[in-house]
Amino acid sequence: GPVIQYGSFRHWIYYLAASKNISSQKMGKPNAAICYVLEVYGILRNKRAFLQHGIITADLSFLYYPHTKMSLFVTSTYDEWKYVNDRYGYPEGYVQELGLCRFDQLHDMKVKKNQILIMPTWRMYIRNEISASDHELEAQKFMETDYYRYWDALLKDERLIRYIEENDLQIIFYPHREMHRFLKYFHVDHPKITVASWPEYDVQTLLKESAVLVTDFSSVAMDFAYMKKPLVYYQFDNEKFRQSHHQIGYFDFRKDGFGPVCVTEQEVTDWLIRLHKQGFANEEIYLERHGKYFDLWDTKNCERNYKAIKEM
């Protein structure tokens, strides 16, 4: 369909005139600061639906009702719904368990049995503290971060490289879009390891076609778990992440997660090798957790969202 240029005069006209604003992002507005005042202080009296772009597991205070005044907050599981409904302060009926629209497409996938996807999330403190204006200083500061050192070390792990060579495996490294400006510092020269970026690679396609996922705290783990595929959480900086990015919520990765939690590259490599020797088959304990957590598991997510928005 037709696309309106972001931040343009036309964007403002449509934004102000619309009776309903539907977005997967809280910040999907012509100007975040001005629109915050218009919406939160009741100047703009439209209905706003927050479709979300991932299942919430952490305590995201910026999504509390006093900071959004959204009319519909979409959740995807009972546990997520209960957490948001009980904690975020929304009026009764505003938080609904409908499922992410994109989940409809996750039931139709063709998996590449030899593809390993490494997809970590971003770090707020890295993005905010490292200036992009000075290239040399940016490179120096980024390459001093644990984020760079740990992920770079995993991509260059000799034992992992030897194993993927011997078994014709392929690794795709695609971090969160907020980190793509730093991709140029990951110097990986190997035909079986690809440092991928948008728009050359589509996130949902990578998730659907990959046999196994290595991530950290990213909500893409939920998409992968939804498809009943094996994954591992590489959480080498858990304490700093909780202090500087997102605080812990209802979800305990070790007790509730859909894969093991590792803190060293050796543990990740060990797990990948062991899993491959098992044919990349998911373990029963994680399949059982899938059945308990995803109480909505069908292709009617878009339908439920559509009906809820019409009734909003």
PLM regions: where:
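Active-site and donor-binding regions of nucleotide-sugar-utilizing enzymes
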Residues: 1-106
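Structural motif
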Residues: 20, 47, 72, 115, ...
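Short, charged/polar "capping" segments at the starts of alpha-helices
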Residues: 30-33, 81-84, 105, 126-127, ...
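A short, gly/pro- and small-residue-rich
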Residues: 33-54, 135-143, 229-240
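Catalytic binding pocket for nucleotide-activated donors in carbohydrate/polymer assembly enzymes
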Residues: 91, 186-190, 217-293
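Conserved catalytic-core segment of nucleotide-activated headgroup transferases in glycan assembly
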Residues: 101-185, 262, 297
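Donor nucleotide-activated moiety binding/catalytic core segment of transferases
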Residues: 177-222
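C-terminal alpha-helical cap of glycosyltransferases
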Residues: 298-312
